[in-house]
Amino acid sequence: MTQKLKIIVLDANILIRAVLGIRTFSLIAEQKDKVLFCTPGVCYREVAFHLPTIAQKRNISFAMEQKALNTLNELKQLIAEIGEDVYGSFKQRALNRIGDRDEKDWAIVALAIALDSPIWTEDQDFFGTGIATWRTKNIEIFFAQ
């Protein structure tokens, strides 16, 4: 019997953890054949935009910042970048679920609704939206299910 591929939507903060750390990238790489990791394209753009500021705040060298940007491009081999054509029709439903929280996160919620999948995040804004959320500290439970 073949096992059904799991799907999970990644928030931008997970992409940041994957490019600046080791554990998150390793978790994704280890599970790439069992889990379809995906994220809205806006998350890749958000990470690329904020990475220089994050690097400066963390005193990360320019060379390491460039390595992180290269890793971000490598992630596209592991994490599918999904276009708004897939989830755009769920925008209003997503905004209704987010409520007065961070409305910029609508694409992540809409993609999760479109794919009927959970979200991997460290952001509290997704809790209470009616979508299962996983944090890095317990994501391996999701992988094992």
Which positions does each model-derived feature cover?
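Residue-level signal for well-ordered alpha-helical positions
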Residues: G21-I22, H50, A132
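Active-site neighborhoods of divalent-metal-dependent phosphate/nucleic-acid chemistry enzymes
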Residues: A80-P118
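PIN-domain endoribonuclease scaffold, especially VapC-family toxins
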Residues: D33, G41-R93
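Acidic, PIN/NYN-like endoribonuclease modules and their adjacent C-terminal/linker elements
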Residues: T2, C38-T39, I113-Q145
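Acidic active-site catalytic centers that drive phospho-/nucleotidyl reactions
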Residues: D11, D105, D123
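Alpha-helix capping/helix-boundary segments
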Residues: I14-L15, C43, I108, D125-F126
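Short, well-structured N-terminal submotif of metal-dependent ribonuclease cores
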Residues: M1-G41
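Glycine-rich, phosphate-binding/catalytic loops in enzymes
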Residues: F25-I28, A55, T136-N138
